[in-house]
Structures are given as C-alpha cells and as structure tokens.
Amino acid sequence: MPKKGKGKPAFSRRRIATGLQVGSYVRVADNSGAKLVKIIGVPGYKGRLRRIPPAGIGDLVVVTVKKGTPEMRKQVVKAVIVRQKRPFRRPDGTWVAFEDNAVAIVTPEGTPKGSEIRGPIAKEVAERWPQLANIATIVV
C-alpha cells in the first residue's frame, strides 16, 4: 500500500534564510515607543526538541521590550521582522542584506502600533504585511 502523503499547506511561502533566532536583540524601526527588543518566541515554528527557533524576514515573532518609553518597557508584544543582516536570495537571483536587524511592533491582529517605519523594509515584508508597507518610508 502506498504511504499517505502529507497535505499541502493552504499557502505556499518560499523559505527565506533565517538570520535571527530566539534570544536575539533587535532594533525597533517604528515609532511605537520601543527602542530595543529581545526575541522570545516564534509562533508556528515546529522543530526538533531543544532546537532554537529561527526567524527571518517577514516572520511574526514574540518579543519583550528591553529599552524604550516607561509604558512600553517590560511588555511582551508581537513584532514583524522587517530587516536582517544575513543575506537572503530572491527568486530573480539577487542577494539582499541590510545594515541592521530591525522589527516593527504590531498588535495581535497584525496592525502596526506605530504610524511610521524608519529606514527601508524588504519587499517580501510589504507583500506579506500590506499594512506595514503603507507606513514604510522605503521598500527595497
């Protein structure tokens, strides 16, 4: 008897090289009040036991605010990775790498908390998160 195959996911997303992981400290690119955050989780990651979950451009992550306004500090919030230092390859063959690692804080529903994103964001983020693209200054 043939083995039963796994069903295809509802959406197909090319896996981008993961440049960050749980424990990474990342700059905040928006004006939500947070300045520096630490990644503490990657929702939806299913991996091997004790493997540190990785995250890349466009991924939703759970972060804790380390530096920022007194109202934002010590809060656990969700964020989307908009820039990463590690180079990743696009389908057209070009390689993209940013100067820093950065996230944008979002609500649990996925709407951005800030009203502007400073610096460039990746095209992959703009395609996956249209609301972030609306408040971004530059899309690369």
UniProtKB/Swiss-Prot annotation:
SMART domains: Ribosomal_L14. One of its GO terms (biological process) is translation. The keyword Ribosomal protein applies. Pfam families: Ribosomal_L14. Keywords: Ribonucleoprotein, Ribosomal protein, RNA-binding, rRNA-binding. GO terms for molecular function: large ribosomal subunit rRNA binding; structural constituent of ribosome. One of its GO terms (cellular component) is cytosolic large ribosomal subunit. Belongs to the universal ribosomal protein uL14 family. NCBIfam families: PRK08571.1, uL14_arch. Binds to 23S rRNA. Forms part of two intersubunit bridges in the 70S ribosome. Part of the 50S ribosomal subunit. Forms a cluster with proteins L3 and L24e, part of which may contact the 16S rRNA in 2 intersubunit bridges. This is Large ribosomal subunit protein uL14. It comes from Staphylothermus marinus (strain ATCC 43588 / DSM 3639 / JCM 9404 / F1).
